[in-house]
């Protein structure tokens, strides 16, 4: 398989590891790709961590040497999307350090209350009512509503925890408006990953454990898929 594709887009949690649990087969798969000099990019809906943090986790905790350049998160894809719009300067953010760093890297001014050109929402484990209030008011006054992803649950060693989709659903209910969703299974993150690697859809395969996110992302983007379990 490593000779058939020029590039591999690979999910992380549930595919290469689960929480702190190592998947030996995942490590062997990455080693084979590295040995064959195949290009691969970890494409994750997790918006809470920076690429450096993701790479460090893979390297230090899962014995998979990784650089930040081999990581593409939904937060990075969201920042790329807003930058391409060209009319967004002030962003009201609900999220964690991964989303913050991605937005700041693109030069956006982050605000905690309106006015704002866009509201960017991802998983925020410090969410509170006031954050939802400010985001609601900003969207009601015309801010674009953009979500990193709408995963309902976040799998880890504790079980299936509430995901970013839980927060997005609350805000969507408040504003009675659907967001632009960036992460898998939407095509925006896949298009960003293709641009990042310089490859075309027919040159890559999407590898993941979740049909509703990873596999549908490939299908929606006309990219071959490989479901692992």
Question: Which residues fall in each region the model found?
Answer:
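Short acidic low-complexity segments
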Residues: 1, 107-117
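Asp-based phosphoryl-transfer active-site loop
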Residues: 2-23, 40-43, 218-219
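Substrate-recognition element of Asp-dependent hydrolases with the DxDx(T/V) motif
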Residues: 8-10, 30-58, 71, 90-94, ...
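Short, acidic loop-to-helix structural element flanking the phosphoryl-transfer center
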Residues: 18-41, 49-53, 69-77, 84-86, ...
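Short, well-ordered secondary-structure micro-motifs within conserved domains or adaptor modules
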Residues: 114-130
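Glycine/Thr-rich beta-alpha phosphate-binding loop at enzyme active sites
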Residues: 148-185
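Conserved Lys-Pro-Asp/Glu-containing loop-to-beta segment of HAD-superfamily phosphomonoesterases
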Residues: 181-214
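Acidic, Mg2+-coordinating phosphoryl-transfer loop and its flanking beta/alpha structural elements
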Residues: 207-229
């Amino acid at each position: 398989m490593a000779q058939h594709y020029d590039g591999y887009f690979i999910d992380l949690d549930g595919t290469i590891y689960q929480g702190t649990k190592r998947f030996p087969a995942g490590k062997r798969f990455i080693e084979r790709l590295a040995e064959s000099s195949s290009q691969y990019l970890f494409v994750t809906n997790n918006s809470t961590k920076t690429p450096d943090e993701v790479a460090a986790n893979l390297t230090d905790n899962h014995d998979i040497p990784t650089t930040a350049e081999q990581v593409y998160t939904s937060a990075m894809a969201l920042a790329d999307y807003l930058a391409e719009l060209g009319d967004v300067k002030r962003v009201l953010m609900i999220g964690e350090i991964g989303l913050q760093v991605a937005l700041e890297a693109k030069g956006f001014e982050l605000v905690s209350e309106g006015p704002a050109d866009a509201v960017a929402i991802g998983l925020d484990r410090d969410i509170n009512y006031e954050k939802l209030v400010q985001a609601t008011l900003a969207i009601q006054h015309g801010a674009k509503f953009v979500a990193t992803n709408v995963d309902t649950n976040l799998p880890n060693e504790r079980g299936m925890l509430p995901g970013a989709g839980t927060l997005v659903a609350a805000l969507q209910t408040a504003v009675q408006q659907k967001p632009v969703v960036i992460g898998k299974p939407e095509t925006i993150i896949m298009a960003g990953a293709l641009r990042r690697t310089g490859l075309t859809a027919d040159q890559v395969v999407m590898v993941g454990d979740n049909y509703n996110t990873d596999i549908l992302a490939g299908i929606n983007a006309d990219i071959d898929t490989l479901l692992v379990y």
